[in-house]
């Protein structure tokens, strides 16, 4: 599993460097809140367009090509960033960024599930997230300092990290193929069949469907928070360096929560709904408190909200992995991400308009109310009884 740990460390370092400052960089280039929201919407619309085709691409042509391509497009994304004074260049950067995210979305998890096996997958996913966050903290602490030295230097450094990952993945890494039993039907490589079978699994498995729908609302809420926390805290008087430290504190909070999650992994595996309900209930409370614009609450509330999505993702991914056959896994994870991308598109448009018209405080109140919907869905899911669709699909492939 060491290769996954190394990849997670480098990806976390890159994310830690650009995440705290890229919105501030847009503001420094005279983009207002509505324009930032619309650029975010462009990013998410492009993700939605690319999500399912990229999953099918990975299922047909292999995980290695998909992940290596993701790193290549990440290099291009951050190469364009210093030139986003032009709206056209900014839109192009958002589209390439979306393609990069879509190509690795689901592929990394599928690769890990093949190596770790279903029994160890959930725990290994959390360990990798833990390591990613550790290096995200390191990157975010350095981010504000690097940005204050030169606003372009952080993006150059991120390019170098993704270049290393691209060379490593392209030249030195071997990815295990899907088992032979899942290759018995040559038609499985037909893109339309892959999508049809994947949709059949989601719609016939009501528990999976409701978790995916809940993901739409959580993606909408947490994407809005991640997009607007920087200008919100900046308006409260926090400096650029302080924002980097707050982002690092969010990473540290996620690290602590992940450590607890790993410790209680077996209990969470038995009842993931309780864990998700607890997380989003706390998220709703913290978002409402943040909306009060009380400076002392800004740091702890933001840190916790930044941490939630990092805990959310491995719990949901581990849960869905149980129902996804390996031959369609990339596409299924991409479909789930695609639903989240729809929520993030609406986040950029709807909450961009709300923030421009009524201010960021009012917008965060609406976000808090939005989180009530997935909490309700989590109480419904355990009451639903479904047949094991994954077993049925895999048996049909062996015939």
Swiss-Prot record:
Keywords annotated in UniProt: Cell membrane, Membrane, Transmembrane, Transmembrane helix, Transport
Location(s), subcellular: Cell membrane
InterPro entries referenced in this protein's UniProt entry, alphabetically: MFS (IPR011701), MFS_DHA3_Transporter (IPR053160), MFS_dom (IPR020846), MFS_trans_sf (IPR036259)
Gene3D superfamilies: MFS general substrate transporter like domains (1.20.1250.20)
Entry membrane topology: Multi-pass membrane protein
Domain of life, per lineage: Bacteria
CDD domains: MFS
Key word Membrane present: yes
Pfam families for this protein: MFS_1 (PF07690)
GO molecular function: transmembrane transporter activity
GO cellular-component term (any): plasma membrane
Entry keyword annotation includes Aminoacyl-tRNA synthetase: no
TM segment ranges: 7-27, 33-53, 79-99, 131-151, 153-173, 208-228, 242-262, 296-316, 335-355, 357-377
Family to which this protein belongs: Belongs to the major facilitator superfamily. Drug:H(+) antiporter-3 (DHA3) (TC 2.A.1.21) family.
Name recorded for this polypeptide: Uncharacterized MFS-type transporter YxaM
Organism annotation: Bacillus subtilis (strain 168)
Organism placement in taxonomy: Bacteria, Bacillati, Bacillota, Bacilli, Bacillales
